[in-house]
Amino acid sequence: AFCCPSGWSAYDQNCY
């Protein structure tokens, strides 16, 4: 899984 930077949504198109 891709780890989101702080402030990103877990459902962002670039975040899985």
UniProtKB/Swiss-Prot annotation:
Q: How is it modified after translation?
A: N-glycosylated.
Remarks, miscellaneous: Calcium is required for ligand binding.
UniProt lists the family membership as follows: Belongs to the snaclec family.
> GO molecular function of the protein, one example?
toxin activity
Describe the function of this protein: Regulatory subunit of the blood coagulation factor X-activating enzyme. Activates coagulation factor X (F10) in a calcium-dependent manner by cleaving the Arg-Ile bond at position 234. Weakly hydrolyzes insulin B chain, fibrinogen and some components of the extracellular matrix in vitro, but does not activate prothrombin or plasminogen.
Q: What is the top-level taxon of the source organism?
A: Eukaryota
What Gene Ontology cellular component terms go with this record?
A: extracellular region
Tissue-wise expression? Expressed by the venom gland.
Gene name for this UniProt entry: LC2
List UniProt keywords, sorted A-Z.
Blood coagulation cascade activating toxin, Calcium, Disulfide bond, Glycoprotein, Hemostasis impairing toxin, Metal-binding, Secreted, Toxin
Q: What is its main location?
A: secreted
Q: List the disulfide bonds.
A: 4-15
Subunit comment: Heterotrimer; disulfide-linked. The heterotrimer consists of 1 heavy chain (a metalloproteinase) and 2 light chains: LC1 and LC2.
Compartmental location: Secreted
Name under which the protein is recorded? Snaclec factor X-activator 2 light chain 2
Q: Pinpoint the C-type lectin domain residues.
A: 11-16
